[in-house]
């Protein structure tokens, strides 16, 4: 695992875009996350598309999760959210963007089918991730199996409450999601986790320096052969080995890719 520390959230977004751009140019399969943390990165990639001609025409993309019970065109579905925030502003083909089928009659089978679809596409080359204050990634809350596949998960009551602002009322918030599991996420060839803000500092410390444990689902990144964690200074405040991470990056060989 490589820990990369930048001064501001804006610099985190720029660094992430720098890492993603070669993958885009090579026609890689991208793993996309929703949420506020990746937005700056998506905006920078959109800017490079508009101003520098960065093309996504040869890319495929897979979303991490989807609400169960919402149609894809619902304004709050994660498919519609990623369209609104990112993919409708670039030249990726609509049919090249996939999300779990939250309307399937058999949700268990839909999870298995999604994992199979990812495998049939050759796997995800680089997966963008955020992290929750409790260490969750995707909707893999504390207690999730470290080798779990794409499956149904029940939202935490706090998540339902937090997401109510996007709906007419809390009663309208779906209680279930279909999410890539930690095992599915681990199959991506490169994991790129972004975190900003002091409220993420404890979770970042747990994922990077704590034990690998279901209590901090993101700690499974310690087992991955190519995981990059980009954080701002505020999110780095709890790291015991912060100075070493800075030293290691400054002395990174020129040939070594992030």
UniProtKB/Swiss-Prot annotation:
Protein name: Glucosamine-6-phosphate deaminase
Family: Belongs to the glucosamine/galactosamine-6-phosphate isomerase family. NagB subfamily.
PANTHER family membership: GLUCOSAMINE-6-PHOSPHATE ISOMERASE
GO cellular component annotations of the record: cytoplasm
Catalytic activity, as annotated: alpha-D-glucosamine 6-phosphate + H2O = beta-D-fructose 6-phosphate + NH4(+)
Keywords: Carbohydrate metabolism, Hydrolase
Lineage: Bacteria, Bacillati, Actinomycetota, Actinomycetes, Mycobacteriales
Alphabetized InterPro entries for the sequence: Glc/Gal-6P_isomerase, Glucosamine6P_isomerase, Glucosamine6P_isomerase_CS, NagB/RpiA_transferase-like
Protein EC: 3.5.99.6
PROSITE patterns linked: GLC_GALNAC_ISOMERASE (PS01161)
MF-aspect GO terms: glucosamine-6-phosphate deaminase activity; identical protein binding
CDD domains per the UniProt record, alphabetical: GlcN6P_deaminase
Involved pathway(s): Amino-sugar metabolism; N-acetylneuraminate degradation; D-fructose 6-phosphate from N-acetylneuraminate: step 5/5
Record: active site: 65, 134, 136, 141
GO term, biological process aspect, one: carbohydrate metabolic process
Function according to Swiss-Prot or TrEMBL: Catalyzes the reversible isomerization-deamination of glucosamine 6-phosphate (GlcN6P) to form fructose 6-phosphate (Fru6P) and ammonium ion.
Pfam families for the chain: Glucosamine_iso
SUPFAM superfamilies from the UniProt entry: NagB/RpiA/CoA transferase-like
